[in-house]
Amino acid sequence: LNTEYFIAKKVIFSKGDKGTISSPIIKMAIAAIAIGMVMMLIAIATGTGLRQKIREKLVVFHGHIQIFAYDNNASEVSTHPISINQEFYPYFKQVPEVTHIQAVATKGGIIRTENTYESILAKGVGKDYNWQLLQDFITEGRTPNVSGEEISNEILLSTYLANRLHLKIGDHCHAIFLKDEDSQTPNQRSFKIVGLYNSGFQEFDASYVFTDIRQIQKMNKWQQDEVGNFELFINDFDRIEDVGYKVYGAVGSFLDAQTIIQKFPFIFEWVGMFDFNIYLIIGIMIIVGGFNMITAILVLILEKTPMIGVLKSLGMTDHSIRKIFLYNATYIIGLGLLWGNALGFLLLWLQQRYSLIKLDAATYYVSEVPIAISSIAIILLNIGVLLLCLLMLLVPTYVITKISPTETMKIK
């Protein structure tokens, strides 16, 4: 029989303690732990969710890694073609982390209607393009058919552009593309809108349209085996920098390789701040909860001073008595964690299910607060909070060693 645990249970569940001074203070400590846990869960779930969503959207439009000609200078517009006949295409055997590779080309232009116009970036894609990644963003219609023998005039437009241009599915839109030689007449194309997408990433929705890569090749007077660049997808985003170095070393001296982290450093620097904010919130909440627990335990020790004196007079060591109060603290913290997890998961579920909190897509790149829950992270958080709070209580429970059995008996 664990004597310390037995006595701790008696102290915790004693009916006579309901109206004592320590009772409301213990309830406040439980509430502080619970509120802190809710805040930490929300910080982790929303911070992780926002980071993942932004990563996913960048990958959909650009892949994890891009390979292009040095002369392009990482431009959004494909100016210098590269041959599709590469050792790494269509299977990048030199770098096994690469799961898919696709050839694309981009060209800047303008879509004009009778009343208005919008600048666009036409992204030409071919048979190897992975439409599945973009499928979640399709709001109406379908993706362009680019696998036929004839050059397709179908186009996928964003709902943002469609609304601004007053266009809908089935409409034909006229686009103008400048040629490389300024003196020549611009290329004009008529596209049929077969689908609309909405990624929530304002920067891309405001310009990106998807069409047949052969349209870009024809306008640029490229050969059928010439493309603008290659987009690579890998199996682990966390290893993107290492894989990027491998790809760079494997493509040869005439081509360059760039990860999306290198392409959009300002976005990833901003996203990196989420981790700092999460750690800051966790640290503050643990400190607040810990100090509330210290107050509760000190009050409980003072209230149970006569009991401590009796236990000491019966021969129980200071170490054993401290264990009794640490058992009590574990129960209080555990109760706070239980309520905190329950309330936190409820709030996260409501946000995930009903999208109650909206965001400005132009600022945050998403239209609503995304939620991502990692079971391992939540388990480690609960264990970490419990252990750190108990560690903080080792010092205040030291006052038990200063309590004299003789003096407590006199008080009693």
Describe these PLM feature segments.
Residues 51-85:
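Membrane-interface junction motifs in transport/secretion proteins
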Residues 1-37, 412:
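N-terminal Sec/SRP start-transfer signal
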Residues 323, 338-381, 394-402:
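Short helix-loop junctions at transmembrane helix boundaries
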Residues 86-224:
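A structural signal for hydrophobic secondary-structure junctions
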Residues 21-48, 272-307, 330-339, 387-393:
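Hydrophobic alpha-helical transmembrane segments of multi-pass inner-membrane transport and secretion
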Residues 179-181, 185-278:
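Mechanotransmission and gating elements of multispan inner-membrane complexes involved in transport
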Residues 298, 307-352:
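Transmembrane alpha-helical interface segments in multi-pass membrane proteins
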Residues 398-412:
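Short cytosolic juxtamembrane segments of multi-pass membrane proteins
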